[in-house]
Amino acid sequence: RSTLFPYTTLFRSNQRSKALGPAEPLVFTGPDGAPTALTSRTMDDLDAAMEAAEEAGGEVVLGAGRIQDFTWKGLLDFSTCTECGRCQDLCPAWNTGKPLSPKLFVEALRDHHAAVAPYLRAAGALGVEPEEVTEEMLARRRADGGPLGRLTGMRDGLASREDLGLAPGSAHTGDVLGALLAAKAAPAEAGVAARPAPLAGEVVPADVLWSCTTCGACVEQCPVDIEHVDRVIDVRRQQVLMESAFPRELGGMFRKLESKGNPWGLAPRKRMDWAKGLDFEVPVIGVDVEDASEVDYLFWVGCAGAYEDRAKRTTRAVAELLHTAGVSFAVLGDAETCTGDPARRAGNEILYQMLAGQNVETLTEAKAQRIVVTVG
């Protein structure tokens, strides 16, 4: 628990509110060697970095495929868990029989980090990749007085329950692996990898990774502001962008977002169907008004508000409310496209940035100053 008190002073929000809202940006090493946040404006930098890495025989790492790919904040998240279980109690995936437990997810990553710490320290000292560190290297480092630490009794590179209970710096009950197995949150033949290994599959089973709805209930309930959702998205990004490993259903959604601008693949011309039957006209920017400067508000309808039957009722109600209140507004019509949030939550950060950049251009051209939204 030694990390608890400094951790609670490092809130992401300057207002010290819960870390809900936008996901953390995807950070990559730019062509100048500096960490660069991926945005629609830095996509060219990512292309240049990937070309430079390919020429040098390396690669640009996107997302967290190994424990060392997490930021210091991510690693601190894992070490600060108090094991209160509030996140698990409120998790909709856990409460509907899915294998995901936010608590066990964090503890598995924490225990893996504690187990592979000797390999990470040795790799840094010897200038090699953690996967290249051998038992002989560890023995030499230990003989030379290197601060390695060591789990005992590993079996085939996996940590036993007793090992996890002895892991340096891990403050847990000592039976996390037993809890993971009982919850079916870890495959019986795997456990928690005690050697450097890919996170997806070796530490976090695929079913666990893709069961998260990214609702944020775990973050909202956490007394120390651990950002479970961002850690899930970090691993998903690596799986989607580096491994192309994701549920088949997401492939269809990605294609529809890219080609049609909405998750269902419906035609853009149907975006105004929600307004049929209203006793007043809904002005469309570029058709009925030149730009948003001619009205009080731009009404951003969103994909669900335009296409989904239940959400259409909400859209109509908001439009009627604005009309009754005498507030002038206009919509973008078929110029509107998805915000890209579904792609971002699923780990496809590049598609998200493409859609976000497109929307920024659209809103800039529309001269939007004040926007009303109903989409979540």
Where do the PLM segments sit?
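Iron-sulfur-cluster electron-transfer modules
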Residues: 69-72, 78, 100-104, 113-374
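Vicinal oxygen chelate
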Residues: 35-54
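Active-site proximal loops enriched in glycine and acidic residues that flank catalytic Cys/His/Asp
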Residues: 85, 93-95, 109, 226, ...
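Active-site loops and adjacent core secondary-structure elements that bind or stabilize anionic groups
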Residues: 9, 23-26
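Non-transmembrane accessory domains of multi-pass membrane transporters/channels
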Residues: 30-33, 50-51, 57-100, 204, ...
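Short, small-residue-biased leader/transition segments that mark boundaries at the very start
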Residues: 3-10, 49, 53
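Phosphate-binding active sites in nucleotide-utilizing proteins
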Residues: 13
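Juxtamembrane inter-helical linkers in multi-pass membrane proteins
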Residues: 17, 51, 55, 59, ...
